[in-house]
Amino acid sequence: MTINLKSAKSPWSSLDGVDQLSLHPIKKAFNKEVMIPGSKSVTNRAFILAGLSKGTSKLSGYLKSDDTYWCIETIKKLGATVEAVGDELHITGINRSELPEKQQVFIGSAGTTARFLPGILGTQEKSEITITSTEQLAGRPHKTLHDALKQLGVKLTYLEKEGQLPVTIKGAPETGGKVSIAGNQSSQFISGLLMAAPLFNKPTEIELTTKIVQSAYVDITIEMMKQFGIHVDVSDDYTHMKVEQGEYEAATLPLEADLSTACYFMALAALNKSTIKINHLNMKSHQPDLEVVDILEKMGATVEKGTDYVVISGPEQLKGNLTIDMNACSDQALTIGSLAVFADGPITITGVEHIRHHECNRVTALTESLTKLGIEVTEHQDGWTITPGDVKAATLDTYDDHRVAMSLSLMGTKVDGIKLLDPSCVSKTCPTYFEMLASLGILVEYH
């Protein structure tokens, strides 16, 4: 298909040609069960490691979305073989020595791929790979990771603007060794270093100079590397990690459901005095958004946890007068921020300054959206204080950000007259999101 640097849309996108949609309030409380698609974070880690593994990996439960499509297209261009067999994806990997001598890959808006791939591409001296992306992803933070890779011997050349994509990556005769990097910008930087580490010429030691943000995502990476045959030594406080040289081995894996996506349905039930059971979840998952279950309980929801499911029942009135540190589960800060509008007192959300540098400035995006809806919100550097009030009808921008779109949609199930522009941005992680809402009895109109 034709690549558009302004768009990450793929054959796995949904809502093609839909410019906006309207949501309408739930007329009757529901009691439903849902199954959630695969985790984007887990899927893209598995795709990349399988693509660099010896043998054929068999992956089930993988997510089909824009981000995962461009990831799989990338590993195919690098030489991996990919075949859909029933519900599984079979990926036959390549050795790093088999990376193409020269190639250009387009990764869409997939931040995970942008952070996981560069180090791996720098492990083969003879290859020269250029990573291109959408304009949105090009401007997100990359330089901290790239500077760390330079410490490890990887050669990077920026083709347009310093610290931004596109970038050309070339290996060197000697790679690996010791590297220092800040941990408070993005856990994806740490994961990218770890995933490349066994393929460098020398053992790699990573030292973090600041506290790590969202260490649970690093846990996901370490666990996934273990499943593909590589061990990581990590200190209890995550300040020091060491990886010996090794070769990834193919794996047969069922991939976890996406707890980030699950949170919108938990929040939906909590907001609308309804009950939802979400099946086939790993309730011992490293995915940090699992913490939202406890936050919803503090807000008054009734929670039942099983080993592979959770049931959320909404209260008569959501509780407010809370201060919630959402640093560990910051992808859901907008979700809780949207619920805060309907609580019985103000809610302050802290610890999420780093989400200013995601698909959009998510802190400012929520401030602007709630203000447009007539809600009093005080923006802080690391979050907001949101005072409940009467929501008025409005047409809201989604900022080409899937998290913004899914979070704002929750308010449309409570208040009539809310329209969302560019709803197809949910295809980044959950193309079927609005169809899933409709299956719960919510009226969704496409325009």
Model-found features: residue ranges?
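Short, structured segments at the rim of ligand-binding sites
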Residues: M1-H447
